Each structure stands twice: as structure tokens, then as C-alpha cells.
Curated annotation (Swiss-Prot):
CDD domains: S4. Residues 17-38 are annotated as: Disordered. This is Small ribosomal subunit protein uS4c. It comes from Lygeum spartum. One of its GO terms (biological process) is ribosomal small subunit biogenesis. Residues 89-169 form the S4 RNA-binding domain. One of the primary rRNA binding proteins, it binds directly to 16S rRNA where it nucleates assembly of the body of the 30S subunit. The keyword Plastid applies.
Amino acid sequence: MSRYRGPRLKKIRRLGALPGLTRKTPKSRSNLKKKFHSGKKEQYRIRLQEKQKLRFHYGLTERQLLRYVQIAGKAKRSTGQVLLQLLEMRLDNILFRLGMASTIPGARQLVNHRHILVNGRIVNIPSFRCKPRDIITTKDNQRSKGLVQNSIASSDPGKLPKHLTIDTLEYKGLVNKILDRKWVGLKINELLVVEY
């Protein structure tokens, strides 16, 4: 299955807030909510919705998510927490959390167009797994810095997680450590995703 490119607000209405997908928020439509979401939720439906939240928030395909679940299952720690750590340490997500991109798809585009350096090397793979003490910077040209400057100016510095630091003057971010569960920017029950 390919990456989702359709209407984003429809997904937000169905699944709830997905800050990585878009900054837009749907208008309140209480009548429609009662119409479509009546009745008891089955266990399968609950698990499917949690999985879809994770997929659409991080912009993953079905196959990528399955691969991350398999990697997390081999770890000795809690599978759900390892899964979230793997997803949060992706380069496109770290750019989004630093405020260098307004959404995760925007961060993917920055990486694909070779505007981002990790430890002084150009990285054009959005799923690149960052490690502690990685330094993330923009290319040293005006165009790259202009793209990141707009996003940094509009981002909220109070929402920066503890495992990341950013220098807004030099357009440089630093990964301090692997994140804790409480700093994940998405309300999700990761155990339901693993069970699915």
C-alpha cells in the first residue's frame, strides 16, 4: 500500500488530532459525529484505529509499520515503547519536533530535496534513524536556510521535547538522548497497535 496523499482533514475527523499530518483543525460538526459514530466500538475497530493513527501521524506505509513492529518485537524491553522510540528517532520526525518543518510530510520533503545534513553529511532518506549526539543542520545556502527559517519562526519553542535542543540562529538541532514515553506528541495506546 502506498503513502496516503488524500484529504487530511477527513482522517483527522475520523481518528482525532494528528499534529504530524497537518496543522489544520476541522470545524466542529457535532451532528455528523452522532450520525457516523453511533453504537458500540468493537475491539477490532479500536485496534485498527490506533494503528491508523500511528500510520497517518508518522506518514508510514503498511509495510514500513510492520517492519518497525517486527524490530520492536525482537527487543528485550516493552515492544510498544520500543516501537514509539524507533518512530520518534526517525529524521523526518525529529525535524518536525525541532520545529524545522511544520509537518512530517514537509520534513520528508526537506530531507528528500537534500536540504538537511546529519553530522556534516547530506542525508536524503527520511527514515534515517538518528542516534544520541547527532547534529542536524541545514545546508549552507540561502534557499535551505530560508525554508527552515519560516518554520522555526512559526513554531512554539515551549513544545520542544527534552531529548532535543535547537539553536535557532545557526539552524542547528541536537539529539541529546533517546526520548521518554511522556514526550511523544500523540495520544495513542501503543499496546493496541502491537496486538493488531
